[in-house]
Amino acid sequence: MFASMAVGGALEWDELHLFHADSPLGPWRPHRRNPVKSDVRSSRPAGSLFEWQGSLCRPAQDCSRRYGYAISVNRILRIDTEEYREVEVSRILPGWDDSVLGVHTLNMIDGLTMMDCLRMRSRFR
């Protein structure tokens, strides 16, 4: 399980923690290297893992400018009880539409892509 947690003064979008279990019902055990990542640009989970170009990928929120500013797509290089490594392979920035202020969530499954965005909208429309 991937999780973001506020531990030891960190914000809940600064660090990535992993947990593993033999059953979905637990007991859940923390990864021995938690937090496995400390980077406000790519730690907070932003959707489910997905396969892309033959690799397992993890979407993450880039909260460097504000909460849910952009999406970092990270290819998982290694994941086991001893180690976790990933590398950024793509980014989705909010600039593709003038009204979009942030890109919060990315999910891809069975050829369908879903994104959750923050948009500027007039209250008086």
Can you describe what each PLM-predicted range is?
Residues M1-R125:
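Carbohydrate-active catalytic/glycan-binding domains of CAZyme proteins
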